[in-house]
């Protein structure tokens, strides 16, 4: 099907018709931390909810289209999210010192082509235009002494772009 444009663009030349393929996955992590221990700078245990279980869900879309230009030549285009994570811990959760929120999303936009050189040999290639965004938050700056907890809520955000290629 048309998703070959992302995984193996040479396979585009094997498609008999133009195609559109849409899909999605719903991801709800089920993670439990038991006996989580965190200490302040003086080594005193900090309090918090234990066991911890993060919340956070992700909808992961993908779409692929293939155009049969001729019997031996096809073009494709894919939009996929090859990597992502989304977890949320409460501000009073034991895991708050690691992260209260972690969200990383990547999108890959990929134009491709496939060409059938002979009956038993095809080539294909594609470009990958990637975009990544991240949002990571945590509680930091706990005080020392007697397990007292101060701290600030810190949010780190970032975005990036990259260009790559794949052949098959």
Predicted regions and their residues:
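Residues that define the transmembrane beta-barrel architecture of outer-membrane proteins
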Residues: 3, 56-61, 105-109, 161-165
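Repeated loop/turn-to-beta-strand initiation elements of outer-membrane beta-barrel proteins
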Residues: 73-75, 120-123
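Membrane-embedded beta-strand positions of outer-membrane beta-barrel proteins
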Residues: 20-24, 77, 113, 125, ...
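N-terminal, post-signal peptide beta-strand-biased segments of exported outer-membrane/organellar beta-barrel
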Residues: 1-75, 79-80
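Structural signature of outer-membrane beta-barrel channels/translocons
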Residues: 12-14, 66-68, 114-116, 120, ...
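Outer-membrane beta-barrel translocator domains and adjoining extracellular loop/strand segments
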Residues: 32-39, 87-95, 130, 135-148
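Extracellular loop and loop/strand-boundary signature of outer-membrane beta-barrel proteins
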Residues: 46-51, 94-100, 148-157
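A gly/proline- and charged-residue-enriched helix-loop-helix capping module
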Residues: 97-111
């Amino acid at each position: 099907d048309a998703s070959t444009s992302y995984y193996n663009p040479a396979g585009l030349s094997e498609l008999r018709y133009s195609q559109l393929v849409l899909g999605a996955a719903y991801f709800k992590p089920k993670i439990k931390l038991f006996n989580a221990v965190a200490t302040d700078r003086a080594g005193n245990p900090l309090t918090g909810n234990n066991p911890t279980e993060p919340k956070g869900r992700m909808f992961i879309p993908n779409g692929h289209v293939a155009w049969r230009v001729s019997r031996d030549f096809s073009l494709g285009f894919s939009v996929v999210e090859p990597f992502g994570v989304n977890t949320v811990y409460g501000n009073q959760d034991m895991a708050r010192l690691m992260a209260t929120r972690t969200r990383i999303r990547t999108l890959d936009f990929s134009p491709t082509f496939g060409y059938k050189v002979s009956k038993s040999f095809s080539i294909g290639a594609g470009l990958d235009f990637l975009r990544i965004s991240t949002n990571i938050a945590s509680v930091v700056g706990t005080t020392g002494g007697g397990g007292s907890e101060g701290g600030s809520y810190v949010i780190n955000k970032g975005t990036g772009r990259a260009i790559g290629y794949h052949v098959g």
